[in-house]
């Protein structure tokens, strides 16, 4: 009530906005100074170029005046750069302080939320709830064991020794069948191996003729190669 009458609420709102406004204004002014800095550097370069031109023309008076302007602009540039450095430091400090403030506010809100959550809890209630959960878990395990228990009784159980004997008999039968297959295959293959197949002889005259034709072809190719070489040498001598 009293705070609203004396305007404390509005002042608190203004205090919250003041850091942000200060940061914005500082950044704007730093940008303005940065533009001024670039302009002054351009003027310094121009004055130096004018001094060089006047010297080449032999006009030392005008060259000296250009250098004086350059010195004046350099002094102004130094002041602008110093102001920029101070404002950048101030901006960094305000941003850091504002970040700390916002962090503190967030942590306070988190603490309030945790307090609200824990207001309806105490250690006794937690222990009681955990005991109930453990009981239900144990009950669930017992139910799972009961459901997964086999329904076969002792009267329906199979003799393991009897199963082993039957398995050995099946293995012996398989071995006998494989042996009989091997014997039958050997018996059927024996007559075929005894028969000899005679093949006709191959004439050798055609082979000799083909060899001679190949040699003749190679000799003709060698002669053609020599002719081509001679022709190329003649063309080279004639400059063709």
Swiss-Prot record:
Primary residence: cytoplasm
Sequence ranges of Polar residues compositional bias: 195-212
Modified residues (Phosphoserine): 119, 193
Mutagenesis / variant outcome for changing residue 99 to K: Leads to severe sorting defects
Consequence the record notes for mutating residue 36 to E: Leads to severe sorting defects
GO biological process, one term: intralumenal vesicle formation
Subcellular location field: Cytoplasm; Endosome membrane; Nucleus envelope
Consequence recorded when altering residue 101 to E: Leads to severe sorting defects
Cross-link Glycyl lysine isopeptide (Lys-Gly) (interchain with G-Cter in ubiquitin) per UniProt, renumbered positions: 229
Outcome recorded upon mutating residue 29 to E: Leads to severe sorting defects
Membrane topology: Peripheral membrane protein
Effect of gene knockout: Exhibits defects in the sorting and processing of native vacuolar proteins.
Compositionally biased intervals (Basic and acidic residues): 229-240
Effect of residue 107 to E: Leads to severe sorting defects. Impairs the formation of protofilaments
Subunit structure: Core component of the ESCRT-III complex (endosomal sorting required for transport complex III). ESCRT-III appears to be sequentially assembled as a flat lattice on the endosome membrane and forms a transient 450 kDa complex that contains DID4, oligomerized SNF7, VPS20 and VPS24. SNF7 polymerizes into spirals at the surface of lipid bilayers. SNF7 polymerization is nucleated by association of SNF7 with VPS20; the process is terminated through association of VPS24, possibly by capping the SNF7 filament. Interacts with VTA1; the interaction requires DID2. Interacts with BRO1.
Chain's role: Acts a component of the ESCRT-III complex required for the sorting and concentration of proteins resulting in the entry of these proteins into the invaginating vesicles of the multivesicular body (MVB). The sequential action of ESCRT-0, -I, and -II together with the ordered assembly of ESCRT-III links membrane invagination to cargo sorting. Membrane scission in the neck of the growing vesicle releases mature, cargo-laden ILVs into the lumen.
Note: Present with 3270 molecules/cell in log phase SD medium.
Swiss-Prot/TrEMBL domain comment: The N-terminus (residues 1 to 11) forms an amphipathic helix which is required for the association to membrane.
Protein name per its UniProtKB record: Vacuolar-sorting protein SNF7
Taxonomic placement: Eukaryota, Fungi, Dikarya, Ascomycota, Saccharomycotina
């Amino acid at each position: 009530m009293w705070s609203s009458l004396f305007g404390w609420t509005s002042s608190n709102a203004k205090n919250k906005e003041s850091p942000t406004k200060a940061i914005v204004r500082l950044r704007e002014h730093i940008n303005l100074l940065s533009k001024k800095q670039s302009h002054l550097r351009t003027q310094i370069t121009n004055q130096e170029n004018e001094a060089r031109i006047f010297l080449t023309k032999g006009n030392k008076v005008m060259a000296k005046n250009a250098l004086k302007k350059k010195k004046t602009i350099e002094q102004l540039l130094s002041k602008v750069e110093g102001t920029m450095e101070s404002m950048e430091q101030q901006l960094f400090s305000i941003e850091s302080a504002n970040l700390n403030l916002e962090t503190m506010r967030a942590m306070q809100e988190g603490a309030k939320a945790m307090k609200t959550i824990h207001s309806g809890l105490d250690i006794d209630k937690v222990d009681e709830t955990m005991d109930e959960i453990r009981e239900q878990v144990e009950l669930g395990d017992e139910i799972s064991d009961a459901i997964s228990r086999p329904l076969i009784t002792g009267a329906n159980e199979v003799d393991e020794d009897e199963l082993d004997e039957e398995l050995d008999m099946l293995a012996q039968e398989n071995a006998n069948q494989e042996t009989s297959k091997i014997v039958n295959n050997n018996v059927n293959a024996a007559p075929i191996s005894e028969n000899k197949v005679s093949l006709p002889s191959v004439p050798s005259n055609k082979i000799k003729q083909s060899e001679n034709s190949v040699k003749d072809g190679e000799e003709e190719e060698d002669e053609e190669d020599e002719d081509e070489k001679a022709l190329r040498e003649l063309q080279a001598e004639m400059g063709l």
